């Protein structure tokens, strides 16, 4: 009899198979049926399942059906889906079996009814779609009523139809707590409170279809960003930066971590509820096992660990350049688009990076918030403080690959590298001169 873990593994394999099948679905929407993504059990197989495994089957079947509906397929609701939505135990009756298969086993029939649902109906208002998401969403049933849903519609220019581009989930109580903290932190640090709200944990679930109409991929294994399809990373949890290619892995990640008493929902660390305070106090509870460096936020530790592993999960679809951090990837995309969303309220100058805007503000205010712990000298930029502190510590983290010489600043290393470049250029010119000299030719 299969174990519960085996069924979880089977679900992951099933999702991978469905995503692979998506590239072959070049048929018209009218020819796609629910049976194409349904999973069948024989009577004997069904009797061997535990109740928890049957519940898992129910969740997967409902999710498959609702994904097709969300993508705009006009489907007649199968009888099995109607039963599963009522949370009735699916009992295989004699009169609900298909004809005997060639292998001699009977499989349950998926009957059609006259009921049809279409979540992307143009006549539906934002409130109606949100109500449908809250009432029917697989994620809502998994994560519970403490999550707020928001959707981001995409518009297909070819068929002039709207579809759900992405669903964002934010935790209600965490959002309220974090909003208060962000506002206080922004007030103390003279920052825009709207920018600080980006620290609120959220889950983004893309639900995109191929805009060329060539294929529909299960649950969308592509993220659509500013006209580019980028890397197969369906689910990213903003609180810790981890990426998951299966919803069940993300769910496990959220629910197996430590649970704050305030709301009962799980996050990667209890101190994630007070990260703004940690920034003020200087607390750094997250330590890298490789080099011992410490960080105040878990996402910064994860980003740092990619330096050791060499992982660069964010790939630009325009030029192929890869990045360790999503923020760097977003900033890079603005090179292609020319977007400068951060504008100075005093002089009107615009910037593509928020850090550039923050540093620019200090030209107007004269603020120097970064103070050296050794001598008390203050700086307007953290990078300048880091460079200055190395004069006290003697640290030289930038090393030349050619000769091994180390430097305290990257600018000094770049200047040093030009020496090797000039040396190589001189060697090349000398070699060419010797090659073309008469004495060399005569030999």
From Swiss-Prot:
Residues 1-23, 99-118 are annotated as: Disordered. Residues 1-10 have a biased composition (Polar residues). A zinc finger (C2H2-type) spans 255-280, 286-308, 314-336, 342-364, 370-392, 398-420. One of its GO terms (cellular component) is nucleus. GO terms for molecular function: DNA-binding transcription factor activity, RNA polymerase II-specific; RNA polymerase II cis-regulatory region sequence-specific DNA binding; sequence-specific double-stranded DNA binding; zinc ion binding. Expressed in fetal and adult brain. It comes from the Eukaryota. Keywords: Autism spectrum disorder, DNA-binding, Metal-binding, Nucleus, Repeat, Transcription, Transcription regulation, Zinc, Zinc-finger. Residues 99-112 have a biased composition (Basic and acidic residues). GO terms for biological process: regulation of DNA-templated transcription. It is found in: Nucleus. Pfam families: KRAB, zf-C2H2, zf-H2C2_2. Its main location: nucleus. InterPro entries: KRAB (IPR001909), KRAB_dom_sf (IPR036051), Znf_C2H2-type (IPR050758), Znf_C2H2_sf (IPR036236), Znf_C2H2_type (IPR013087). Residues 32-102 form the KRAB domain. SMART domains: KRAB (SM00349), ZnF_C2H2 (SM00355). It is linked to A 7p11.2 folate-sensitive fragile site, FRA7A, has been identified in 2 unrelated families diagnosed with an autistic disorder. FRA7A is associated with a CGG-repeat expansion in a ZNF713 5'-intron. In the first family, the expanded allele contained about 450 CGG-repeats. It showed hypermethylation and reduced ZNF713 expression. In the second family, 3 autistic siblings exhibited a heterozygous expansion of about 70 repeats, corresponding to premutations, which were partially or mosaically methylated. Mitotic instability of the premutation was observed in one affected sibling. Belongs to the krueppel C2H2-type zinc-finger protein family. PANTHER family: RIKEN CDNA 6720489N17 GENE-RELATED, ZNF44 PROTEIN. May be involved in transcriptional regulation. This is Zinc finger protein 713. The lineage of its organism: Eukaryota, Metazoa, Chordata, Craniata, Vertebrata.
């Amino acid at each position: 009899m299969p174990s519960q873990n085996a069924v979880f593994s089977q679900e992951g394999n099933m999702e991978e198979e469905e995503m692979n099948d998506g590239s072959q679905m070049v048929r018209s929407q009218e020819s796609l049926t629910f049976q194409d993504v349904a999973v069948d059990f024989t009577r004997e197989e069904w009797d061997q399942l535990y109740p928890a495994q049957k519940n898992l089957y129910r969740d997967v079947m409902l999710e498959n059906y609702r994904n097709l509906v969300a993508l705009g397929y006009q489907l007649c609701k199968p009888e099995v889906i109607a039963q599963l939505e009522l949370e009735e135990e699916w009992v295989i009756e004699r009169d609900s079996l298909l004809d005997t298969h060639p292998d001699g086993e009977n499989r349950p029939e998926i009957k059609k009814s006259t009921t049809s649902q279409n979540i992307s109906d143009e006549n539906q208002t934002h409130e109606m779609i949100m109500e449908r998401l809250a009432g029917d969403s697989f994620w809502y049933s998994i994560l519970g009523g403490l999550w707020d849903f928001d959707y981001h519609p995409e518009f297909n220019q070819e068929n002039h139809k709207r579809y759900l581009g992405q669903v964002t989930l934010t935790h209600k109580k965490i959002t309220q707590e974090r909003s208060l903290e962000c506002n206080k932190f922004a007030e103390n640090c003279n920052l825009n409170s709207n920018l600080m709200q980006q620290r609120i944990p959220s889950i983004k679930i893309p639900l995109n279809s191929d805009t060329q109409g060539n294929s529909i991929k299960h649950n969308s294994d592509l993220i659509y960003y500013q006209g580019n399809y980028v890397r197969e990373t369906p689910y990213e949890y903003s609180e810790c930066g981890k990426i998951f290619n299966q919803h069940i892995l993300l769910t496990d990640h959220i629910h197996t971590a430590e649970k704050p008493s305030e709301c009962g929902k799980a996050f990667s660390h209890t101190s994630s509820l007070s990260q703004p305070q940690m920034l003020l106090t200087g607390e750094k509870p997250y330590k890298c096992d490789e080099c011992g460096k410490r960080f105040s936020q878990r996402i910064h530790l994860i980003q740092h660990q990619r330096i050791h592993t060499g992982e660069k999960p964010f790939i630009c679809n325009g030029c192929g350049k890869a990045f360790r951090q999503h923020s760097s990837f977003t900033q890079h995309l603005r090179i292609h688009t020319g977007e400068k969303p951060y504008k100075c309220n005093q002089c009107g100058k615009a910037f593509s990076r928020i850090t550039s805007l923050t540093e620019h503000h200090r030209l107007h205010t004269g603020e120097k918030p970064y103070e050296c712990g050794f001598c008390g000298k203050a700086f307007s930029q953290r990078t300048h403080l880091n460079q200055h502190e190395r004069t006290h510590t003697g640290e030289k983290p930038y090393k030349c690959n050619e000769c091994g010489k180390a430097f305290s600043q990257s600018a000094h290393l770049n200047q040093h590298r030009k020496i090797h470049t000039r040396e190589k250029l001189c060697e090349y010119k000398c070699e060419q001169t010797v090659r073309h000299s008469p004495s060399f030719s005569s030999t």
